[in-house]
Regions:
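Active-site loop/oxyanion-hole signature of alpha/beta-hydrolase fold enzymes
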Residues: 3, 9-50
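Catalytic nucleophile loop
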Residues: 51, 55-56
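Conserved alpha/beta-hydrolase catalytic His-Asp/Glu region
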Residues: 84-90, 100-162
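Acidic catalytic loop of the alpha/beta-hydrolase fold
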Residues: 148-149, 172-177
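Short alpha-helix in the alpha/beta-hydrolase fold that links the catalytic acid
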Residues: 155-156, 164, 178-187
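Short beta-strand/loop motif that positions the catalytic acidic residue
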Residues: 162, 168-170, 174
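Catalytic histidine-centered segment of alpha/beta-hydrolase-like enzymes
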Residues: 201-211
Length: 214
């Protein structure tokens, strides 16, 4: 995008990448306020927000909290349109963290290759994920994020009733966020959206078919 003349800002959300692993509840509101704080500190008046996977939930929440900042919403393989069985107890215990690490850490990096339709074209992607496992608090962040999910229909109806343009982009072979499971629901809550399917791609269509995506 930057090569095509766009001004682009990307960030690692709390608990991801090189951002701080907070000892806090990892809610959509926490992430949204992180984005809002960055926008306001940079004195940016309006932004086009792109949210990938769980990032789709985050940009929806930004639009809920600060709609005046949002010029467009672009959802890429967003996980935010599914019905969620909300957790009653949202706290994360040390046992849950230890169990998660023991059960998932040996294979979690290799599992990232399942995001692709053609993982053989992305050798080494799993190695990059290994770096995240080195940071204290990463497992807790993943668990807390999942526990704080809820069904976002109210927010999406609010967005539908606003003047914010909405775009949804999907890989045609995404096995992580399966479009067929919520196809009818998204049509009911966001009928004005413009929708695109990227051919020959899984959960990361911008990486597998960048020519069509761009």
């Amino acid at each position: 995008l930057s090569e095509n003349g766009y001004s682009v800002i990307s960030l690692d959300l709390y608990g991801r990448g090189f951002s701080q692993n907070l000892n806090d509840d990892y809610t959509d509101e926490l992430f949204a306020n992180q984005v809002i704080d960055l926008i306001e500190n940079l004195d940016i008046k309006s932004v086009k927000l792109v949210g990938l996977s769980n990032g789709g939930r985050v940009i929806s929440k930004v639009a809920d909290l600060k709609p005046e900042l949002v010029d467009k919403l672009i959802y890429v393989a967003s996980s935010g349109f599914r019905v969620v069985n909300e957790a009653i107890n949202k706290k994360v215990s040390k046992k849950e963290v230890n169990d998660f690490i023991e059960k998932n850490y040996p294979t979690i990096s290799k599992g990232q290759l399942a995001d692709f339709k053609y993982p053989e074209n992305h050798i080494g992607w799993d190695v990059k994920y290994e770096d995240l496992l080195k940071y204290k608090g990463f497992a807790r962040a993943l668990i807390s994020t999942r526990k704080n999910h809820y069904t976002m229909d109210r927010i999406h109806v609010k967005i539908q009733n606003s003047d914010i343009p909405v775009y949804t982009i999907w890989g045609d072979s995404d096995n992580v966020v399966v479009y067929k499971k919520f196809e009818k629901r998204i049509e009911l809550i966001l009928p004005k959206r413009k929708e695109f399917f990227i051919l020959e791609s899984g959960h990361l269509p911008h990486m597998e078919n960048p020519i069509q995506f761009n």
